[in-house]
């Protein structure tokens, strides 16, 4: 039996009208709404299924903004409380770590952990960094930029995560 090998360029998720091959699926991800609707999955071919692009986009994607005056990171951490999050700055990097122990949900028990590391621009004032968690679970890490030529104060330190009562003003992806 011959198996066709696809170049990664052809594996791009192009939406519901360009399904991915069954062999390209993410095993262990569970069933999705379109898996339960037979006319969507079998209309084209029984060996094709819809792309998981939307699912991947909805799973904790971060957004980094760096403009003239400030540097901001938005990170979706809706499954974590401020006590579960650790944010620290080390040299030119900000490290965000989240971990919660096993807890029960509607489908059984689940534990989550992630670790993100971002490079800070050299002109970010590290003494004025802040981090907050909105009511809808959006973590916002920000710091002002200083004029070039001034010392931005690089050192290792922890940044406390404060909780906001209002939803985030970050744009939805």
UniProtKB/Swiss-Prot annotation:
Residues found modified as Deamidated asparagine: 101, 123
Binding site for Zn(2+) 2: 107
Gene Ontology CC entries for this record: cytoplasm; nucleus
Nucleus keyword on record: yes
Region Disordered, annotated ranges: 145-173
Single GO BP term: protein refolding
Residues covered by region (Required for complex formation with BFSP1 and BFSP2): 1-63
Binding site for Zn(2+) 1: 100, 102
Binding site for Zn(2+) 3: 154
Subunit structure: Heteromer composed of three CRYAA and one CRYAB subunits. Inter-subunit bridging via zinc ions enhances stability, which is crucial as there is no protein turn over in the lens. Can also form homodimers and homotetramers (dimers of dimers) which serve as the building blocks of homooligomers. Within homooligomers, the zinc-binding motif is created from residues of 3 different molecules. His-100 and Glu-102 from one molecule are ligands of the zinc ion, and His-107 and His-154 residues from additional molecules complete the site with tetrahedral coordination geometry.
Name listed for the protein in its UniProt record: Alpha-crystallin A chain
Organism: Cavia porcellus
Gene for this chain: CRYAA
